[in-house]
Amino acid sequence: MAVPKRKMSRANTRHRRSQWKASAPTLVQCSNRACREPKLPHVACPSCGQYDGRQIHEPA
């Protein structure tokens, strides 16, 4: 297993960690023409309850 030769400074550690960013979720429009709400891809629409043209669950 690799072991660091020297202690990494606080500035270098923080500079390296500053690159770890959370990306914003990708949103798509609901395929239901009456709804068109933004939703996550490959997930049933939370407002109308449809997925791939089928009614999966009751609308919220």
Curated annotation (Swiss-Prot):
Q: Which residues cross the membrane?
A: none
Q: Specify whether Ribosomal protein is a keyword of the entry.
A: yes
Q: Which residues form the signal peptide?
A: none
- Ranges where the record places region Disordered: 1-20
Q: Compositionally biased, Basic residues: which spans? A: 1-19
Q: Which residues form a coiled coil?
A: none
Q: Which GO terms describe its biological process?
A: translation
User: Which keywords does this chain's UniProt record carry?
Assistant: Ribonucleoprotein, Ribosomal protein
| InterPro entries per the UniProt record, alphabetical | Ribosomal_bL32 (IPR002677), Ribosomal_bL32_bact (IPR044957), Ribosomal_zn-bd (IPR011332)
The record's NCBIfam families line, in alphabetical order, gives: rpmF_bact (TIGR01031)
Supply the HAMAP family for this chain.
Ribosomal_bL32
Similarity comment: family membership: Belongs to the bacterial ribosomal protein bL32 family.
Q: What PANTHER family is this protein classified in?
A: 50S RIBOSOMAL PROTEIN L32 (PTHR35534), LARGE RIBOSOMAL SUBUNIT PROTEIN BL32 (PTHR35534:SF1)
Q: Under which name does UniProt file this protein?
A: Large ribosomal subunit protein bL32B
Q: Which organism is it from?
A: Saccharopolyspora erythraea (strain ATCC 11635 / DSM 40517 / JCM 4748 / NBRC 13426 / NCIMB 8594 / NRRL 2338)
